[in-house]
Amino acid sequence: ALCIQSILAQEKMFVHRSDKITQGVLLSVLDSMTFVNEAVLLHLHDQDAPTYSMTEIDSLSFGDNSLQIKILYSDTGIEIVNPLAFEGVSISVDDGNVIITSTISEEVEYILTGTISNGMFKIYSDKKFILTLNGVNITNADGPAINIQSGKKVTVNLTEGTINTLTDGKKYADSGSED
């Protein structure tokens, strides 16, 4: 009973995937979790149920709800903690490029740390947000280090005591799109 009470005291279940992406799901919308044929099915109220193969999941943990998304850049891979994965913030990673699409109504904080020699942070957002640079060094040889596709207010915070370096390419690659 103590274990059950501990889980109920938490607000989110975090799925730590083997690709270094962590997704959080509100326990209030989690109907059930089923293990079937080497896959894990998460059944959410009023949403399509995501399916993960057992090899995709590194671990599960429980914690508080947060409006902070953490992105750790590294030339060996990008680590992402997205507690809002099922609430309107989708994140994809393509090589060193992190692309975020946010439709959530709350003000989200994106915290960038680490170093990448060829990457980018790109965000499409319907609402204002906070971008915190916490010792980040992003170099993008063929485009911007940070690409903000939002007409809303962006607050940029620089964490005290850190050095942040953003290096854009000398010549941008032609993407054929608005950004």
Feature map (PLM): residue ranges:
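A composition-driven surface/loop motif
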Residues: 65-179
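Sec/Tat signal peptide C-region and signal peptidase I cleavage site
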Residues: 4-9
